[in-house]
Amino acid sequence: MNFTELSAALSEMGLPSYRAKQIYSWIHQKCALDYDEMTNLPLSLREKLKEELPLKKCTIECKQVSAEDGTVKYLFGFGGNEYAESVLMKYKYGYTICVSTQIGCKMGCSFCASTLGGYVRSLLPSEILGQIYTAQRDENIRISHIVLMGMGEPLDNFDNVMRFLELVTCEDGLNISMRNISLSTCGIVPGIYKLLEKKLQLTLSISLHAPYNELRSKIMPINRRYSLDELMPACREYAKVTSRRISFEYAMLGGVNDSDECAQKLAALLKGMLCHVNLIPVNEVAESPYKPSTPERIEQFISILEKKSINVTVRRKLGSDIDASCGQLRLRKIKEQ
């Protein structure tokens, strides 16, 4: 809840207004995960809060740290055998965390491990925040950038994600700039238009992964509902109205979507749009039939796009020695039970 709502809830409990400032600061600035940490509150009040206003728990069920680059992969538990994953990455500019918005995913992308364990439910704003707060405390760092690109589809959890954005950008909380937040969608067109109405200064990322309908429908079932014929006009409108550059995510799947022809079609699809392409060297997943593209194929793909004046980058491959692809840790945990 935001500060106004917390104040109202505490007022109904008969508490003075200054308690709201204390508690809000503990939760959203000091990242307290339990009332017992709030040492400037009387013990009796802490016990009352536990009973009447319990905090959502977000516990570390598993943690992997890359020996190569320090990337940290978390499996968080939310009770009742419900798990979601986050990845903490260190860059020159600071720390970025990739958080989940759902437990599992409905979208069924054939190359994504998030779908393999099945969909359970959407995460609440407090549970999305909990991933950030728990990681900050665990590593004793401050996170400056957030990527909503973990397990789940953010636009399928629209209201909770919007509420999360309100809380994480609040100046009385973590106060993270909206420009330091990226939201990734597989292409839920009505959700893109709803997001457009909000006029937020975040970065919209589109999980594209194929430049024509036949291939995209094969690897991404969402394309059968919202094809490129609907998705691309929505993207062009979003970029035009917000003046924000769209990032098109493109997982390089060896022998599937990495041909010269695919590069040519991708360039034609994006021609004239305010955007850039982020090529993703995929991590291998044992349960997936897909293999990563070779470095030579990626370079050729880049060359074709650049010759067509398409802005393209290759995502730095982090955590290759751990299960850094979203869904892998959760799937392993489910199999163990």
What are the roles of these predicted feature ranges?
Residues 72, 84, 95-99, 107, ...:
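Generic beta-strand structural signal
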Residues 90-127:
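Canonical Radical SAM [4Fe-4S] cluster-binding loop centered on the CxxxCxxC motif
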Residues 115-145:
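Conserved alpha-helical substructure of the radical SAM core
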Residues 136-145, 150-308, 312:
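Conserved AdoMet/S-adenosylmethionine-binding subsite of the radical SAM
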Residues 1-84, 236-244, 250-337:
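Auxiliary Fe-S-binding modules of radical SAM enzymes
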